Amino acid sequence: MASNKVSFIFILFLCVLSTAEFGEAQNPRGRKCEDPNGVDQKAKCYIYCNEQGFLGGSCQGYTNHYMCECYVG
């Protein structure tokens, strides 16, 4: 019975990790950006994310709400 509980908790833990986009760094306090296509022509997101300790970033979002999204790799 105890092994069933351990298995259930382990599976639940894996489900939480998979929905949290494990391996992709998220920066909830991002910077607003102007390039709606993720191009980041002025490299504002790239520079901002490097200053935050990430390897890079791009401009993501929807109409009138584009933010820099930083990532690890």
Swiss-Prot record:
**Biological process annotations from GO:** defense response to fungus; killing of cells of another organism
| Record's signal peptide | 1-25
Intracellular or extracellular location(s): Secreted
Which cysteine pairs are joined by S-S bonds? Answer: C33-C59, C45-C68, C49-C70
Of the GO CC terms on this record, one is: extracellular region
| This protein's UniProt keywords | Antimicrobial, Disulfide bond, Fungicide, Plant defense, Secreted, Signal
What family does the database annotate? Belongs to the DEFL family.
Q: What is this protein called?
A: Putative defensin-like protein 33
Organism in which the protein naturally occurs: Arabidopsis thaliana (Mouse-ear cress)
The record lists the lineage as:
Eukaryota, Viridiplantae, Streptophyta, Embryophyta, Tracheophyta
